[in-house]
Amino acid sequence: MRLTYFGHSAFLLELARTRLLFDPYLRENPHGSVDPKSVPCDLVFCSHAHSDHVGDALELARLHHAKIVAPYELAEHFAAQGAETIDLMPGGGVTLPWGRIDMTPAIHGSALELGDGKTLSMGPPSGFVVRADGQSLYHAGDTALFGDMRLIGRHGIDVALLPIGDFYTMGPADAVEALHLLRPRLAIPMHFNSNPKIRVDPHRFAAEARRTGHPVRVMSPGETIEV
């Protein structure tokens, strides 16, 4: 698996037969604007409806003829605008020719921002477990720590992408606790330092995680690694 980080919670996962883009906050990403044309993908994953996770999903779908994977209500919103979608709900999943997607619960919100302080609920927030090429990756979306992370990790997770920014999601201490439940081969922090409220030192999180036996890689925006 080849993984590229764009900052915030946006990642591109390149598998042997497909390219998956998670929470595609590209053009307006505070870590550095990325042109959606420059990120070819086959599936676009949106964990929930907040603008920093929906990002450029519709534009990417149109540019690259990609399908959008999202919770049912959010997928219906995209479908009404002409996108092809795969609609799931937490606890459900789908097997595709290249592998399997399972949608996991998350503890957060999922409202579409309509402007003038108005919002529209778009169903539950979510995370995703992807299994392909003999490996697995968990993108937690935006979430608090919750005990059923132990169930998510029960069949083995190779790479876990976890929010650590606090304020709107779990912070570093709870993210370390999440690692005790998930037991991934490698953890990568996300959703931090993209606005003043969620400023944390990811290297302090990494040091504490390593101290308790959990390998961590802190990725820089624009960095690509093999996992």
Curated annotation (Swiss-Prot):
Name the UniProt record assigns to this protein: UPF0173 metal-dependent hydrolase Oter_4201
Disulfide bond residue pairs: none
Family stated for the protein in its record: Belongs to the UPF0173 family.
Record key words, sorted: Hydrolase
Highest taxon listed in the record's lineage: Bacteria
SUPFAM superfamilies xrefs: Metallo-hydrolase/oxidoreductase
Keyword NADP applies: no
GO molecular function terms noted in the UniProt entry: hydrolase activity
